């Protein structure tokens, strides 16, 4: 049986998973139908959870010069204040998703991953001890496992027979990148705004280019594959925002606020991640953030399974943990789209929620939820060890488990999958010792009992 893991789809989620597997030393091949990252990028930012996960693996350093941090967030386009939230958490980062894809591909290749572009998958088959994938030119690629990161219309999910229930709400719109002249009327509408008939967002994405996104409810939606004309976008902007959109159109497209989730993330040796597992309206970067979390959660578990040291049911915990997270993300974005309806319908409700968002506890709750930092990962706190200064996330760069002793006086734990680190106590962490999984999730913390049980549950017997 081959020990290769096959990843269908070389977008950010598939490439992040490839990086995780490559870091663990697993033979990995990515099959991607496009010959290069798609331009222009549909997404222009990553949220706090992606920043933290990239920092855990040393990836953010390669992206720092490609974008900039911004301390803004929103819930259904109701402004929030991330800078008022206590704790050492990351902020969002503006960077085109195509550039994220390029950086991840560079890293994956440096870790020995084979990234095969212009390679389309046409069929998938499970065997008793592996998987077989047939490509467009008739080649059969064999592996131990297949992970479908091939988007909302996933062929892998379809051929694995995994249902994909959900809703197609009556909310849809247009978006386009438009080159405009200085002083163009549309520049007076910079930002995301709700209007009587819907929403219109205008965001600069270059020296003379803006991205324009419109959204309307209760209006018949043309077929998703129907070509968008500039006149259609101009008419929508005028109808909703009451402003003329003049300029030279570049990329134009249409979108819908579809929300769907796979019934299960695993079918034998086939697994799903990213949009193949859950499709949601990409508000505040939640869609990509949820997908990157899938990749980091799955990577070490799949590596442990392929390498033979995984405890029983470790791989099954991927569905248990990430399906619940995906359901929550879908619910969050559905709730937001509900209160993004026209002001004529929900104006009073939005006014009340805007007032509530001014309360510190409500602001903090919403910032953490939309940023994906409300879970069980630690912040990147500076640490001092006998070897010198480090931080929580630097300890995780190797992709191993970490037992961090912050004054608990634990005996040095010797486990082949866990690194023991003794650091000076810090009041920035509410624990005297923590056991971190390779994905940064806290598996145990002192003074609770159960360290040995947690080690065996997540990393197997020490010998």
UniProtKB/Swiss-Prot annotation:
It is an enzyme of class 5 (isomerase). Binds 1 FAD per subunit. The FAD cofactor does not cycle between oxidized and reduced forms and therefore does not have a typical redox role in the reaction; it plays a structural role essential for PyrE3 catalysis, to maintain the requisite geometry of the protein and position the 1,3-diene and dienophile groups through specific interactions with the substrate. Gene3D superfamilies: 3.40.30.120, FAD/NAD(P)-binding domain. FAD binds at residues 13, 32-33, 121, 275. Its EC number is 5.5.1.-. Pathway: Antibiotic biosynthesis. Disruption phenotype: Cells lacking this gene lose the ability to produce pyrroindomycins. Its cofactor is FAD. It catalyses: 4-[(2E,7S,8E,10E,13R,14R,16E,18E)-14-ethyl-7,13-dihydroxy-2,16,18-trimethylicosa-2,8,10,16,18-pentaenoyl]-2-methylidene-5-oxo-2,5-dihydro-1H-pyrrol-3-olate = 4-[(1R,2R,4aS,5S,8aR)-2-[(2R,3R,5E,7E)-3-ethyl-2-hydroxy-5,7-dimethylnona-5,7-dien-1-yl]-5-hydroxy-1-methyl-1,2,4a,5,6,7,8,8a-octahydronaphthalene-1-carbonyl]-2-methylidene-5-oxo-2,5-dihydro-1H-pyrrol-3-olate. One of its GO terms (molecular function) is oxidoreductase activity, acting on paired donors, with incorporation or reduction of molecular oxygen, NAD(P)H as one donor, and incorporation of one atom of oxygen. Changing residue 275 to A: Loss of catalytic activity. Loss of FAD binding. InterPro entries: FAD-bd, FAD/NAD-bd_sf, RIFMO-like. It holds the Pfam family FAD_binding_3. Keywords: Antibiotic biosynthesis, FAD, Flavoprotein, Isomerase. One of its GO terms (biological process) is antibiotic biosynthetic process. Belongs to the PheA/TfdB FAD monooxygenase family. Involved in the biosynthesis of the spirotetramate antibiotics pyrroindomycins. Catalyzes the intramolecular cyclization forming the dialkyldecalin moiety in pyrroindomycins, via an endo-selective [4+2] cycloaddition reaction. PANTHER family: BINDING MONOOXYGENASE, PUTATIVE (JCVI)-RELATED (PTHR43004:SF19), TRK SYSTEM POTASSIUM UPTAKE PROTEIN (PTHR43004). Homodimer. This is Dialkyldecalin synthase. It comes from Streptomyces rugosporus. The lineage of its organism: Bacteria, Bacillati, Actinomycetota, Actinomycetes, Kitasatosporales. The gene is pyrE3.
